[in-house]
Amino acid sequence: MKFKLLVFAFFVVATSMAQHKISGIVKDSVGNPLEMANIIAINQSTKGLESYFITDAKGYYKLNLSNNATFELRISYLGFASKTFVVSTSDAQKDMTKDFVLYENSDKLNEVELTYEMPVTIKGDTLIYNADSFTNGKEKKLGDVLKKLPGVEITDEDEVEVDGKKVSKIMVDGKDFFDGDSKLAVKNIPADAISKVEVLKNYNEVSQMKGLGNDEDNVALNIKLKQGKKNFWFGEVTAGGGPDDRYLAHPKLFYYSPKKSVNIITDFNNIGEVPFTFRDYFSFSGGFKNMNRRSGSNFNTSSNSLGLSMAKNNRAKEIETKFGALNFSYAPNKALDLNGFAIYSYTKTDMQTNATVTTLTNAFSNVENQQNNTLQTSQLGLLKFSAQYKPSLNFQLDYDVFLKNSNLEEVNNINSVSSITGDNTIDINKDDNPFSVNQNLNIYYTLNAKNIFSVAVQQLYERGNPLYNSLNTDQRFTILPAIDEAGSRFDLTQLKKLVTNKLDATIDYYYVLNDQSNINVTFGSSFNEQDLNTHIFQTLDNNTKIDFNADTLNNDVNFNFTDVYLGLHYKVITGNFTFTPGLKWHSYSYKNIQLGEELKQNPTKLLPDVFVKFDIKKSENITFNYNASTEFTDVNNLAEGLFLRNYNSLFSGNKNLTNPLYHNYTLRYFNFNMFSFTNIFGTINYSKKFNTIKSSATLLGIDRISSTINSSLPEDTFSANLRYSKRYGKLKTNASSRVSISNFNNIINGDVSNSKTTTQDYTASVATNFKKGPNFTVGYQTTVNDYETTRTTSTFTTDRPFANLEVPFFKSFTLLANYSYYNYSDKANTIKNNYTFLDADLYFQRDKSKWEFKLSVTNLLNTGSLNQDSFSEFITSTSQYFIQPRYWLLSLKYNL
């Protein structure tokens, strides 16, 4: 069977490669090559677009044409009269060379109307893909379309990357789609509504600011809709059901016009498809940017302080979700633009994990077997309103307000059997209701061609009230004065309240020297205040509460942090080089009051940075970036009273922590050849860390007491990424590699040891893209993790062959299948785990019908669990994580 599949794949590849080639040069009347002239080949029998090319800098073109056919070549260039040429191919005919000379058209830019649009066109910094040129009509969502575009990748987290850079915003007809969130866009925008995909490189939302700074890392997508989708409501309604009360309901509705847009997305299911996780919730910025990122210093507030469990690979034993989202935009006039969104998500997740944890130190050894059952519910709410006022090209005002509110609950039941402590049953309850409101005001003003100003003010209010409760048959820590009631479990509760107020402001002044250079002066400030209160108590069998009032067991901390800084940058473009050196001077002041003492520190820092770009040619460049940065921890790591982190883990902060210093170096190479659809992207990054904040842990059997310290030992990280993709006719090849090396230090039981981790990831794949007939993707991924310490060395390898299949048959049927095989092992041959996932979907839809029927089988091979292992110098963990069993679902979709 494997041999037959191999022969079939070879036959498909060989057939696609058996083509006739015609190449040559396109020149003007005096012999100068014409770069970016368009050449298309129309099959005279089918009247379809057979091949196309855009000439390179030397005017060169190359077309691949099918044998035994006649084609009309159409050659065009803006401002020149077009030409046509008829050519016939045959098996016996050799490859052909043909040059073309175009003559300037003085009357009109181009009199010939092209019947077919070019698959790819370039307009300045915008790369425009004609979606129909890369798709075959079987695509369902935007993500399916983007995967077929050269240079565009979709990550496992549904983030979009172009040339290795994360897309910061996705728009539809120029309007933000849920503030540009990529996951909601790739999963919900219907593929059949897409006309073009515009890649906006060097993107800047404010036209006045474009080109003043370095926007090379800013990439946005604009999805252009087909004409039939404008000024009309469109969308789809999907409903389905299956055995064991499986259900799915997924209505979506969209409306776009020049003045307004509405997007409505809903999703109700219990089949494990989670449209919006609380990982998405915590990372969802609402379009708000970190204002201090360019300043070189960061003050980051903690999120998910409860330490909630995360689903692995978006899978769990059972998942039920209810999701609803509304996004709108409205432009009452040319000067004012209003938009906003509301999102609600409810998810109930049932997780089960069995684990064996082995601890081996110089003082003791212990083996603990755990069975952990977790029931987690989350209700997440987000609300945002934005207004943009732009009465002229010289003035723009933006205002945003963004609210986030949630209710998070988690119940854990843990059975622990330890070689030291014996049997133990633990029930853990976690609850939190975090709330935040973020406001943003931006003003951009162009006084004249030489003087440009921008002002930004951002305010954040954040509140959290996490509750932690545990019922434990053992008293884990003698430091806690718990009362031992015979035959009862220890009932401990920790209440925590954290309030954060943050106000950031910056003023930027740009003095434009000429078209190639400008000077930027920045004055900024950041004011932060945090109030933290924690309290631990025990509840007895008669519901009496025993408060632990010792100062070391509670926290009452007030923390203030202020950063005032002045920055200077100079940008100059000379020849093919862009050079931007900069310097920031920071004056910091931070104060924390706890345990009756006040601690103040007033450090200053001078942080340099430099950006260099060398344009080898229009679509090939090298960039280098260096910056020095520093980071300040929030109050959670400074509070010295005890925190209950888990049934076997306590934590205490360190009020004397100081800020670490980072030196970051990044070198990037980018090359996109749209003439051959070859994309090469590479990055090398090196980061050196000084005065790092480290966790210092004391292990006592299965228990751990941790704190934080500043380490004088330097640590560094090196990483390199390389991605290569190329198209050969109907074949798309991809290859990528990632390597990272980290040197860091562990402090356990007072001993300091150096550790080195090396991660290597290599992936290669081949995919076909035929308009008719089967399509497939086959690939192989291998990941190697090396962990080296002063005591031991371990190597873990994961091999994953994967394949995707798309088979249309009987005109109205399409079969889709996705297969992945995981093989996990270690170099010492002590671990060997493997599991397989196979999902299949059978679609039925008549031509031009609005109805679609779908039969889905998920986890077809009924894989019951995922096996995972982790390793450190003292602790080795092997876990079995259970997932949803095989199920099938019959669904019906109606396209509106």
State the predicted function of each range.
Residues 19, 25, 31, 58-62, ...:
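Membrane-proximal, glycine/serine-rich, low-complexity loop/turn segments characteristic
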Residues 30-43:
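Short, ordered, surface-exposed loop/turn motifs in non-cytosolic proteins
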Residues 42-48, 70-86:
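A short, solvent-exposed loop/turn motif at the edges and junctions
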Residues 45-60:
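Short, acidic Ser/Thr/Gly-rich low-complexity loop/linker segments typical of extracellular
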Residues 371, 548-554, 652, 658, ...:
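Outer membrane beta-barrel strand-and-loop segments of large Gram-negative receptors
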Residues 384, 492-580, 592-597, 613-615, ...:
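Outer-membrane beta-barrel transmembrane domain signature of Gram-negative proteins
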Residues 763-781, 794-896:
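Conserved C-terminal beta-signal and adjacent last beta-strands/turns
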